[in-house]
Every structure is written in structure tokens, then in C-alpha cells.
Regions:
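A short, hydrophobic/aromatic-rich structural module that often spans a beta strand
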Residues: 125-136, 152-155, 159, 226-237
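Conserved, short, structured surface segments that act as functional micro-motifs
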Residues: 114-124, 148-223
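Surface-exposed strand-loop junctions at beta-sheet edges and helix termini
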Residues: 100, 144-145, 150
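Bacterial N-terminal signal peptides
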Residues: 4-14
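Residues that cap or initiate secondary-structure elements
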Residues: 86-88, 129, 140-143, 181
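Zn2+-dependent peptidoglycan hydrolase active-site motif and core
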Residues: 92-94, 98-141, 168-170, 174
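Surface-exposed, glycine-biased beta-strand/turn segments
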Residues: 18-119, 161, 198-342
């Protein structure tokens, strides 16, 4: 009760300035020179070779396909790739990696081959009364350890090019700002993914990334901006209604996302998702559903699967959840076999 009261009061009080800073000395995001900030990708499309910097930004920025007269970028990039500001004579990046805000190191992966992230670490930040997680990937060296309390600008490691699909020429920092989907990820991984999960709850599949560059740009305009306000202002692409069955951990952890009374009875929840699959709103719903059901979607003449990383399918004003979409809902709602969750 007291925790709920404290959280409610914290949301009603005037917002305190949130301290955020970019994680390297490359600040060209703020200078209007994105080509000097983002690391480009190598692209060959319809016989044309290019190196677009846009491929290092957040969102659907990779893997173009032609659909009639349209060219659609179909691959989702969940963070941003930041160029090195300086290199040694051999071309190795020298940039130190800095914490974007005060927090605690909660995960370190020093074995590059255990993730597409290569060597990476995760920091938990208490921002606006809630846990927000930052991910720093492809590092050459990690100097922080789990449990370390860090300040804004604390050194976490050094930029590198470990992980999948990256070499020395394209060395960069991959940065994400995320919500934790489930506190029981091991159960979901056992039920739906298989293999070995080396990263506990801090596996990349359990971290839902927001538009991190957009967050930094908006925060620069308004230093009192809360991350929660930024997330809930993200446009919804589709909504899914799920049966309401007992207490929902994600909604309890992110009460700021709930519109209406979390404790008021209702037969279902309606969850708003961005096109990338980030939850951006939760509403108690009077609708009766037997299983997760798409109840709203942005009207598009392009098949929804191309615009939502395959989470939903269909055209125009109608859509259904794909297998990937159903697995996302299972992760978000802890809807997986209890025996798997126990392992």
C-alpha cells in the first residue's frame, strides 16, 4: 500500500530534472551532423552500393525491399550505433564508454561469442521512479563489474568491434535504452527459444528498446522530460487486448503506463504497442476476449508484417498476431509454462 502511495505521489509531484548524457565524446547528434554521429552500414540494393548513416540510427533502417513502387526498410535496429571520435594508428577506436546517467551495473558479459552484442554490459537507472536500463555493446574492454554504483559519465569500458556483423572499420558503440519485459525471462527462453541463456533477465530479447536518439534530443530541449512521458508519447501502431487474469507484473512495475485505475476490475487489458513492439500504453478494457487479440491497427496499404518486424500480419484496418507476436505477448504477460519458469 505504502509503495503504491509513494509511487502515486511521485507521479504527481513536479518533475525533477533528469540527468542524461551521451555515452561517448561524440556529440554530433546535437550539431545537426548525423553522418558524423551514426556509424554507417554497408548496403547493396538493386545493384547500388552505398554506406547510409541512417542504418546506424534507431528503428526500421535496414534491409530494404521493393514492394511495387515502394521501397520499405524492414529490419528493426533497436538502438543507435555511435561512431568513434578518435582512433589509434591501426584504426582501433580509443573512445571511453560512459554511463548515460546515475545507476547500478546489473550485468556484464565479457565473452564476445555469447551474444550478437559481443562484449556488453547493462546499467539499471532509477529515472522518474522506475527502472530504465541502458545497454552498451560491441565493447573491446569492460572495466565495470556487476554491482558497481556509477554516476553520469562514469567510465564503463572502451569502444570496440566485438560481436556479429562488425569489423574494425565499422567499430562503434551500440547503445540502447530499454524497459525490462519480464522478471522471469528464463522460463520464456526455455519455452520458446531453447539453447543456453547466458544473460539471465538481461538477454537482449527481454529488453524492449525505445528511440534513444529521440529521447536525447527531446531531453536536450526539455531537461525536465521524464523517460515515462517520452515512452507514452510514442505513437501506437497496433493494440492488443488480453484476458485479465490476476496481477500483471509488468503493469504493476510500470504503473505510469496504465491509463485508469490499475485496481479497478475489468475483464481484459488493452495494450498499445509502437510499430517496433515497445509497449506504450495499457488501459483496462470492458471487452471480453479468450486470447490475445489485435483490436486496433494503423491503416496501411503495405502489409503490416513489413512495418512491425513481423509481429502482426494483415492489411489495411485489420491484423492478427503472428507467432512472433504471440511470443511477445507471452513474454510481456509471463504467460509460459510454470515448470519452464522454475528451471
Amino acid at each position: 500500500m505504502f509503495r503504491h502511495l509513494a509511487l502515486t505521489l511521485s507521479l504527481l509531484l513536479p518533475a525533477a530534472a533528469v540527468e542524461l548524457q551521451l555515452p561517448t565524446e561524440n556529440h554530433h547528434l546535437f550539431s545537426g551532423q548525423p553522418d558524423k554521429f551514426y556509424m554507417y552500414v554497408d548496403r547493396i540494393f538493386e545493384g547500388e552500393v552505398s554506406k547510409p548513416w541512417e542504418g546506424g540510427s534507431f528503428g526500421f533502417v535496414r534491409t530494404p525491399i521493393r514492394l511495387g513502387s515502394d521501397v520499405v526498410l524492414t529490419k528493426f535496429h533497436e538502438g543507435i550505433d555511435i561512431q568513434p571520435a578518435k582512433r589509434d594508428k591501426a584504426g582501433n577506436p580509443l573512445d571511453l564508454i560512459l554511463s548515460v546517467s546515475d545507476g547500478t551495473v546489473v550485468h556484464v558479459s565479457n565473452v564476445a561469442g555469447r551474444s550478437n552484442y559481443g562484449k556488453y554490459l547493462v546499467v539499471e537507472h532509477q529515472l522518474g521512479g522506475d527502472s530504465i536500463f541502458s545497454v552498451y555493446a560491441h565493447l573491446a574492454e569492460i572495466t565495470a563489474a556487476p554491482g558497481d554504483v556509477v554516476k553520469t559519465g562514469s567510465v564503463l569500458g572502451r569502444m570496440g568491434y566485438t560481436g556479429a556483423g562488425i569489423n574494425r572499420v565499422r567499430a562503434h558503440l551500440h547503445l540502447e535504452m530499454c524497459l525490462l519485459m519480464s522478471r522471469h525471462f528464463g522460463g520464456w527462453h526455455s519455452a520458446f527459444s531453447g539453447g543456453t541463456n547466458f544473460h539471465g533477465n538481461f538477454n537482449g530479447m527481454n529488453l524492449a528498446g525505445m528511440d534513444v536518439a529521440g529521447l536525447f534530443l527531446e531531453h536536450r530541449k526539455n531537461p525536465e522530460l521524464r523517460v515515462q512521458e517520452f515512452v507514452t508519447a510514442t505513437p501506437a501502431y497496433f493494440k492488443v487486448t488480453i484476458p485479465r487474469d490476476g496481477q500483471w507484473d509488468f503493469a504493476s512495475r510500470h504503473r505510469w503506463m496504465v491509463k485508469g485505475d490499475l485496481a479497478a476490475p475489468s475483464p481484459s487489458w488493452e495494450i498499445s504497442f509502437s510499430a517496433t513492439g515497445l509497449p506504450v500504453g495499457i488501459t483496462p478494457s470492458p471487452r471480453e476476449v479468450a486470447e490475445p487479440t489485435v483490436t486496433a491497427v494503423r491503416n496501411s496499404r503495405i502489409a503490416h508484417r513489413h512495418l512491425t518486424r513481423g509481429l502482426i500480419d494483415g492489411n489495411g484496418p485489420s491484423a492478427t498476431l503472428t507467432r512472433s507476436g504471440k511470443q511477445l505477448l507471452a513474454l510481456l504477460t509471463d504467460d509460459f509454462p510454470k515448470e519452464a519458469a522454475a528451471r
